[in-house]
Every structure is written in structure tokens, then in C-alpha cells.
């Protein structure tokens, strides 16, 4: 199997494309010190020296490394784990198995209930249709957290988390787009 590698705007992350489905339940992120991970490929990649985060998108895997390490020393091990996983006949990394979805929802960061109103619905619609696809191309994800007093709070995940250019993307891209389409939005901040 040929796993393609794409660079992201974040020098500490790489996007791995196995050419197969990765997640059927939406984007999901795991951190190295999370003891509750029930996804075998996440555990295997995070057990490699220098990896600190693994992020599964629909058809890609983003891996974040420690800042002082070199990708050339790490890529082979990550690709090897991905190839090994799929060569054993596994179809997807994160499937729609309800038990697994429950496990994942318990291990993912604290999800707050989404406020229900027209502005929030419009924010989520724009995030889903215009912003998330662009962020996914860079190996990341953006999720809505809250809207209060004109301020939209979002969470950046995957390669976007800790990326040097994420503040510029947030202000010049996300904020400008949301303010353009939704007059009630005055600012966008990340948690």
C-alpha cells in the first residue's frame, strides 16, 4: 500500500493519506498521554518516540511531533504502522460501531451542548460548508464551541492546533467569512 505524505502549514505536523477510509464518525483527535484511547492505530502511532498527537479525518491521518525532532527520523515508523494496520484487513480506523462511538465520545474533549438559535445554526452551517473543508485540506478541523456577545469561540484540532499561522487563518479567514455572512458576529476566538 502506498501512503502519501502531505506537508501542512504547521511544521510539527504531517498529513498521511492511506488511500482508504480512516474515520466514519467524523474527525477525532488523540493526545499521547490519554490513557483511555481504545483505537489501536492511535495507540500504535502515539507509542512511537516523538509523537504527541494523532488526528483521524475522513480519509487522512495527521500526526504531530515534538518540536525538536526531525520528520525524516519519524516518517518511516508512522507509515509502517499505517501499512501494518490496513494490511491486516482492517477497512477503517474509526468505524460506526456504536460501542466504539460511545467510547470515543467519552474520551474526546468536553463537548458542550450546542446552543439552539438561528445565529448559531448559521455559524455551524458556514463552518461546515465553507471552512471545515479548507481546514481539513491542511490536516485539521475546526469545531464550534459557543457564541456569546458577538464572539464565536471555536476549537482548532489536528494540524491547526498550535500552528504558527492559525491565528492569521482564524482572524483573516474564519472571522472575515463569518462576519461577512452573519452581522451578529463581531469576533472569532480559539480555545
Where are these predicted regions, by residue range?
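Domain-level signature for proteins that mediate thiol-based redox and metal-cofactor handling
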Residues: 1-191
Amino acid at each position: 500500500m502506498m501512503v502519501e505524505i502531505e506537508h501542512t502549514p504547521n511544521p510539527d505536523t504531517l498529513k498521511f493519506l492511506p488511500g482508504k477510509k480512516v474515520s466514519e464518525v467524523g474527525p477525532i483527535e488523540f493526545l499521547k498521554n490519554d490513557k483511555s484511547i481504545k483505537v489501536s492505530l492511535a495507540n500504535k502511532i502515539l507509542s512511537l518516540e516523538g509523537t504527541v498527537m494523532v488526528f483521524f479525518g475522513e480519509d487522512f491521518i495527521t500526526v504531530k511531533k515534538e518540536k525538536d525532532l526531525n520528520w525524516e527520523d519519524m516518517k518511516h515508523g508512522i507509515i509502517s504502522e499505517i501499512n501494518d494496520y490496513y494490511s491486516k484487513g482492517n477497512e477503517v480506523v474509526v468505524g460506526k460501531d456504536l460501542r466504539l462511538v460511545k467510547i470515543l465520545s467519552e474520551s474526546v474533549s468536553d463537548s458542550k451542548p450546542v446552543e439552539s438559535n438561528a445565529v448559531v445554526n448559521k455559524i455551524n452551517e458556514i463552518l461546515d460548508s465553507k471552512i471545515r473543508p479548507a481546514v481539513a485540506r491542511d490536516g485539521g478541523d475546526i469545531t464550534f464551541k459557543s457564541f456569546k456577545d458577538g464572539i464565536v469561540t471555536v476549537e482548532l484540532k489536528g494540524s491547526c492546533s498550535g500552528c504558527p499561522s492559525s491565528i492569521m487563518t482564524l482572524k483573516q479567514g474564519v472571522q472575515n467569512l463569518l462576519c461577512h455572512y452573519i452581522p451578529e458576529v463581531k469576533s472569532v476566538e480559539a480555545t
